[in-house]
C-alpha cells in the first residue's frame, strides 16, 4: 500500500491514520497472545510501519489520540492541566503526531492539549476542521468558533504546521464547496495575527468571487433551535426533519415542545437564499440546491405534527388538504432538490457514492407517496384507523442534550436496518 501511495503522489509525506482504536489488543489479539497494554501495542505497531516508511523515503504522521487514550484509559480531551507524560509510551521522535480538534470552543482546552502533545513529540501538527460532515448542511458557527480558538492556541505555542479537515460522515451529503468559508478562515488566520472580519470577507471574495455573508446564510439550515445563537451543539435538524418518516414522526415532539413555526422559518430562509443565489453566479447550483432544500423543509419539517393533530381531531378536511395539496407540493420541491444534488455531485466528484444520496432522497419521496395512499384509504373509509398515527410521539433526544442525529438508518425508522450480530 505504501509503495502504491509513493508512486501515486509527488509528496513524500504520508498520513498513516491509526486513530480511534479504542479496543486495541482486547479482541482477537488478546485471545491469541494474551494481554498487552494498548499503549505498548500502538507504539510497537507504529514503529513497524514507520520503519517501512523510512525504507521508502516517506515522512509519516499519525493521529495522536491513541497515544493519549491508550496511556490514560480515558477520553482524548479528558486530561488535567498539569498532566505529566514522562512515564507514557511515546512515538518515535521523527513520527509526526497530529492533534485533531474541531469540537472545543475554548482556547484553554487547545492550549492544554498542545502542552501534552509537546511532551510526547517534537513534531506536533494541529488538525482543525470546516464542518461539512454534520448532515446535509454546513455548520459555520461551530467552524469559526473552534478554528479561532484552536489556531490562537497554535500561535501561542508556536506550532509550525496546521491543516483543515473536511470529513464526509454518513455519505458526503453536504456539497464540497460548502467547505470554502472554513478553508479561507484557516488561510486568513495564517496570515493575520488576529481575526479581522472585514479583511476575511474581502479575502473570501478575492479567492472565490462570492460573498462570505451569502455563504454564512447556510448556517441557518441547522440553527432552528438556536434562537439566533451559534450552533455549538451541532444540532442538525435539516437532516432528520427531511429524512424522518411523516407517519412515524420520530422527531416531531421536539418541534411541538418548542412551538416552532418551521414553515415560516424555512420559507424565510428560502427567500434569503434566493437573493444570495443572484449574488453568486459562480455558485448558482449550490445556492439553488440549498434554496430548494429550505423550500422543501418549509413544507416537510412539521408535516408529521400537522398529520397527527388533524388525525387526533378527526379533521378529515385538513387530512384531505394534506393528502392532495401539501404532500404533492413537498414531493415536487424535493424532486427538484434531488436533481440539484445530483448535478452538484457529478460536477464535483466521480459518480461512485452518489447512489447512497439518491437512495436517501428518493426514499423520502417514496414514503411521502405511501403516506398519501394511507391517508386516502383512511379518508375514504377503507380503513378505520392509521396505526402509525395512533401512537404517541415521544422525545428522541434527552433533555439538555444536543439535538443531533447524523446516522440515516436511525432517522428513518425505529426498526434498525443494521445487522446487530
Please describe what each predicted stretch is.
Residues 3, 7, 11-14, 20, ...:
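Substrate-binding groove of N-acetylhexosamine-processing glycoside hydrolases
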Amino acid at each position: 500500500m505504501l509503495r502504491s501511495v509513493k508512486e501515486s503522489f509527488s509528496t513524500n509525506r504520508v498520513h498513516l491514520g491509526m486513530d480511534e482504536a479504542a479496543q486495541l489488543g482486547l479482541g482477537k489479539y488478546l485471545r491469541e497472545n494474551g494481554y498487552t497494554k494498548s499503549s505498548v501495542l500502538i507504539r510497537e505497531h507504529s514503529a513497524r510501519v514507520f520503519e517501512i516508511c523510512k525504507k521508502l523515503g516517506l515522512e509519516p504522521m499519525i493521529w495522536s489520540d491513541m497515544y493519549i487514550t491508550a496511556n490514560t484509559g480515558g477520553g482524548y480531551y479528558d486530561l488535567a492541566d498539569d498532566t505529566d507524560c514522562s512515564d507514557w509510551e511515546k512515538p518515535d521522535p521523527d513520527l509526526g503526531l497530529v492533534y485533531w480538534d474541531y469540537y472545543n470552543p475554548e482556547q484553554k482546552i487547545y492550549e492544554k492539549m498542545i502542552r501534552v502533545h509537546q511532551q510526547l513529540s517534537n513534531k506536533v501538527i494541529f488538525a482543525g476542521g470546516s464542518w461539512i460532515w454534520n448532515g446535509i448542511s454546513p455548520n459555520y458557527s461551530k467552524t469559526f468558533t473552534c478554528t479561532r480558538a484552536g489556531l490562537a492556541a497554535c500561535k501561542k505555542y508556536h506550532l509550525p504546521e496546521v491543516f483543515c479537515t473536511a470529513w464526509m460522515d454518513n455519505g458526503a451529503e453536504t456539497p464540497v464547496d460548502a467547505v470554502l468559508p472554513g478553508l479561507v478562515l484557516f488561510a486568513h488566520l495564517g496570515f493575520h495575527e488576529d481575526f479581522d472580519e472585514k479583511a476575511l470577507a474581502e479575502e473570501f471574495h478575492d479567492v472565490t468571487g462570492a460573498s462570505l455573508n451569502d455563504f454564512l446564510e447556510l448556517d441557518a439550515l441547522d440553527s432552528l433551535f438556536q434562537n439566533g445563537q451559534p450552533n455549538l451543539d451541532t444540532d442538525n435538524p435539516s437532516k432528520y426533519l427531511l429524512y424522518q418518516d411523516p407517519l412515524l414522526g420520530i422527531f416531531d415532539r421536539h418541534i411541538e415542545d418548542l412551538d416552532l413555526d418551521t414553515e415560516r422559518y424555512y420559507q424565510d430562509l428560502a427567500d434569503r437564499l434566493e437573493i444570495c443565489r443572484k449574488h453568486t453566479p459562480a455558485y448558482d447550483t449550490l445556492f439553488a440546491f440549498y434554496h430548494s432544500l429550505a423550500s422543501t423543509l418549509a413544507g416537510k419539517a412539521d408535516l408529521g405534527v400537522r398529520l397527527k393533530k388533524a388525525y387526533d381531531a378527526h379533521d378529515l378536511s385538513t387530512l384531505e388538504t394534506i393528502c392532495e395539496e401539501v404532500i404533492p407540493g413537498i414531493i415536487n420541491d424535493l424532486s427538484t432538490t434531488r436533481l440539484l444534488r445530483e448535478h452538484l455531485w457529478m460536477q464535483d466528484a466521480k459518480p461512485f457514492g452518489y447512489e447512497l444520496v439518491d437512495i436517501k432522497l428518493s426514499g423520502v419521496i417514496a414514503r411521502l407517496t405511501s403516506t398519501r395512499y394511507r391517508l386516502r384509504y383512511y379518508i375514504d373509509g377503507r380503513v378505520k384507523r392509521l396505526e402509525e398515527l395512533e401512537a404517541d410521539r415521544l422525545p428522541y433526544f434527552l433533555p439538555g442534550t444536543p439535538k443531533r442525529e447524523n446516522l440515516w438508518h436511525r432517522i428513518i425508522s425505529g426498526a434498525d436496518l443494521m445487522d446487530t450480530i
